[in-house]
Amino acid sequence: MNKILFSLGMLLLTVAAYADGTILFSTAKGSIDVPPYRIPGITCGHGGRLVASAARLVCGTDPGFGRVDCVVKLSYDNGRTWSEHEIDVACGDTSLINAHKTPMEAAYGDPAVVMDRERNEVLIMAVAGCTVYGKPSTNRQNPNLIAAIRSTDGGRTWQKPVDQTEDIYGLFDKGNVVDAAFVGSGKLFQSRVVKVGDYYRIYAALTARPNGNRVIYSDDFGRSWHALGGAAALPVPGGDEPKCEELPDGRVIITSRASGCRLLNIYTYSNTKSGEGCWDKPEKATMDGLALAPSTNPTNGEMLIVPAMRNSDGKPMYVALQSVPTGTGRNNVSIFYKELASPDDMRNAKVFASGWDGCYQVSSTVSMYSSMDLQADDRIAFFYEETLTKWGTKPNPVSTSFPQGEGEHNYDGCELVYKSFDLETITDGKYCVNRRINRGKFLKANYEDIVDSFVLTAAQKRKVKDVIKRLPAEPTSAQMDAILKGEVR
């Protein structure tokens, strides 16, 4: 009888978590002397594993104003239960802050997290030190620092942070120089298609000035990095906090924070292994014609593209999801969706930015940053900020950003809430997740239409289309490169 009651209790707990959400990190339960939380990120591993990351704002706000720590909580059952206590990833040290040089160990904030799809290895990229991104004193000689923090046991323990500041800033020194940058927080993106060496490729989108976003990638799970498109590439010159995702054909899409829209651009490889290729032109996705619209007070959001089936006719396709607050303020976080069923849905950035099909409202109150990923049980893990608790203000530290320690900063944060949804709920029953999709078959019609637009002889087009017909269920990067270049030999 006790076993039956225990099982029933666990079932009720599971239903409650799915219906109402689970607060993983709480600010409202604290005080002016208890660190608030912000900046959610979530990544899904194999076997139902989830890692939820957050910034513990010991100073009360962003890195640059004092100590900030990176922390995580873990789930091994697709979010039904979570570790009771938060796990320290990297903790800042206030005593190191000074007015002469910013030490990396002062703070670790704005975490961006990814778990390898084949291992229990987890990577967090964090902005480090004590410089304020927008301050003129934060420059190439005194930059925002960038730390890489690694776990090899699924997030239970973490290695010492590694300073990658010069490794990343240096990628752009011979092109469009970066004065200040940090990796867009939330979820780092790992390719489902591109694998060079031992790991699937990972991508990180940078908030950077001047000239907006850059994208970097790594083939060794963040031990070394390369600039996507080269040192001079400017994929979204007006972009703020960005994220990356991958189209079914292996192209990379960047989505960036902006007022009343998302700024999008697409990178097409000419040689996936070497990273060569080019960016399209940035476009605005305003989600015109829907009941809700992206907020005019922009925040960081997430894009996720999932394999799906259209329920009305059983057609296999993909569905793009984009989370962002809606309305006039930082509130009403929602998920917009768009079906990717034909070449016209994703041929270029302009086409991708238009024709969104609907929107699902997650929150009906103050809500801001969000992150999402596809769980092993085919539900969408959604981790976001809800409600804002303001406890007051604190004085700024004596640092390179505030040499005299002048001024004050807010001491506030949010409830970081985990929910999970099936795709039917988000899309009003129109689609369900379909991992059995034959990607090669899905891409064939798309590729044939693309090849028809190429300037090739009839014989050359026939040769390329013959290769397209023979595509396997999981085409290689080299096969896709050759088709998109029209250079099949």
Give the predicted meaning of each segment.
Residues M1-I4:
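Positively charged n-region of N-terminal signal peptides that target proteins for export
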Residues S7:
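Anion-recognition interface
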Residues M10-Y18:
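Hydrophobic h-region of N-terminal signal peptides that target proteins for export
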Residues Y18-A19, Y447:
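Short stretches within intrinsically disordered, low-complexity N-terminal or propeptide regions
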Residues D20-F442:
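Asp-box/BNR beta-propeller blade signature and adjacent active/binding-site loops
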Residues G440-V455, K461-R489:
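Charge-rich (acidic/polar
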